């Protein structure tokens, strides 16, 4: 049974990635509005091997020693081979530069790496936890705190934050309640919007091209918050009505 499951999973992945053998962006809506960029993306995709395309979906986390960020296992080798799309927990200018130069100087296609970090309640300037901020109902201040965090994080080379957490929390036993905006879906939705706009520089995607903005990531999957018994990563059991009325709104 295990072999059959593995075969089916492998076949599904192969079928999905089979379409990657041809340039895939020609039919997409252009978010850049720059045809030269679109043509370059098409060109790079046509040059990539299947392994390199899969590698762009892989993210590895860096560890630290006294000299700065280090990569464990074969991650550094994979980075040099162009088989890493993003790195997590590299958060100094020197660390980012070291990893980026490695990718740009030694990989075949010189595709830059995307650097992500959990910028949850400030980067260098620390703000109250999101739950505490939400108690103020001050959306503008929450937008500004996210904008300040984006300004500081982007100066360190970070381009992507795993925030805001927009899970609705209704069980105080869950250990991640303080990362979100609490139990109210309406307030949670307004705060999610304010924080995303703060991180990304507004509600226009083009502001992501600014040097002082970062890509936001509303997390986690909807209905991750009502984990049974408050145990993180546990299952959730709820009706369709509860899902759509209480847990989905912040994601919409």
Write out the residue ranges for each language-model feature.
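N-terminal accessory segment at the very beginning of proteins
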Residues: 1-3, 23-24
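Glycoside hydrolase catalytic-domain context in secreted enzymes
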Residues: 15-252
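Sec-dependent signal peptide recognition
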Residues: 2-10
């Amino acid at each position: 049974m295990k072999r059959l499951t593995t075969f089916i999973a492998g076949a599904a992945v192969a079928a999905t990635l089979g379409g990657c053998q041809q340039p895939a962006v020609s039919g997409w809506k252009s978010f850049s509005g720059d045809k030269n960029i679109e043509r370059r993306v098409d060109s790079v995709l046509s040059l990539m091997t299947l392994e390199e395309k899969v590698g762009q979906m892989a993210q590895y986390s860096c560890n630290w020693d006294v000299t700065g960020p280090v990569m464990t296992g074969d991650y550094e080798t994979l980075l040099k081979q162009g088989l890493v799309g993003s790195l997590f927990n590299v958060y100094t200018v020197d660390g980012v530069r070291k990893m980026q130069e490695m990718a740009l100087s030694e990989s075949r296609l010189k595709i830059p790496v995307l650097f992500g970090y959990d910028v949850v309640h400030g980067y260098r300037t620390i703000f109250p936890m999101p739950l505490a901020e939400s108690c103020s109902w001050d959306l503008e201040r929450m937008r500004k705190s996210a904008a300040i965090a984006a300004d500081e994080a982007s100066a360190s080379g970070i381009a992507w934050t795993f925030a805001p957490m927009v899970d609705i929390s209704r069980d105080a036993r869950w250990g991640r309640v303080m990362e979100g905006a609490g139990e109210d879906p309406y307030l949670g939705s307004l705060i999610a919007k304010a924080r995303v706009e703060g991180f990304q520089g507004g509600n226009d995607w083009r502001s992501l091209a600014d040097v002082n903005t970062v890509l936001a990531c509303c997390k986690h999957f909807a209905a991750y918050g009502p984990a049974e018994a408050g145990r993180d990563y546990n299952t959730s059991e709820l009706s369709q009505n509860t899902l759509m009325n209480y847990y989905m709104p912040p994601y919409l």
